[in-house]
Every structure is written in structure tokens, then in C-alpha cells.
Amino acid sequence: RLRYFVRVTVTRGYASSLIKEQEFIVQVAQPAPETNTPVKMEVGIEECLHIEFEYDKSKYHLADVVVGKVYFLLVRIKIKHMELAVIRREAAGAGPNQHNESETITKYEVMDGAPVRGECVPIRLFLRNFNLTSTYRGINNKFSVRYYLNLVLVDQEERRYFKQQEITLYRAA
């Protein structure tokens, strides 16, 4: 986890040193992206499950709303429910010293029960409610923060079928 802080050390000759740290927040404002294309993808398992999902855009403001839909083209397995999760992946360091951390920010159920062919499930996720930061890619080849939308289908035998889609988050100027 990346953090910014000021550390003050008072060295005393007659006793141990005093050390105090104070964290602070750095906000990097960015202009809104000029192009923001929708994300549309078809995924599936041959002859078992075939879905098409769509998100209205690929780049979101931190207070934006993710709007989308999942359309079931073929359903031959018994789906129990469908979840949508926001995942943050942080990477710090380089080469063999790189440390990766993944955190599920939120997960919620968008559908309960078995869908039928032709069913369309709407998605609406308000990002403002979560503690998110902007996306950072390869800062000095030492640090990155990336976000993913993870769509998960769970069947009756608790098998999980998922598709992750990277999204970009930004803080408006």
C-alpha cells in the first residue's frame, strides 16, 4: 500500500530518539478523457453458456456510475447467481522485488436465480460510495494502481465463471 508521510526525528543525546510520522493525502487532478468508448464483449463456454456484457464506458470519474447490462445468449447450465466486484491491484517495486496486492473493494449480487435465453440483466454501480483512487500505470516503473470490474457467475455446484475487465478511474481537474 502506497502512502505519503512526513517523518520527524528528534535525536537526543541523553535518551532514545523521538520519531513521529504524519500521513497526508496527495490528489492528482486530471482532465476528463477525450475518448471514452463503451466496453462490449461476448464470452462463454462452448455449447454451455454464452453471454454478452456491455459497460457504458471504459473510463470513469471517481464519483461516476457504472452502467451496463448482461445479455444471456445461451444458458445450458444452472446458474445460481451473478455478482459484480470492483478489484484494486497495486504493484510496488521492480523485478524480483515487486510486491503485488489485490483487494476486492466491493462485491454485490446483480442477479439471483437461473436466467433464461434472451434475458437482459441491468447493472448500475455507484462508485462514489467507495474509497477509490485514480488509476496509475507504471509510475517510474516502480508503482501502479489498476482497477477491474469482475463479473462472476456461480452455478449450482458452486463453480465460478468470471470475466475481468480493466477500467480507468480519474479525478477530474
Where are the regions a protein language model picked out?
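C-terminal beta-sandwich interaction modules and adjacent acidic
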Residues: 1-173
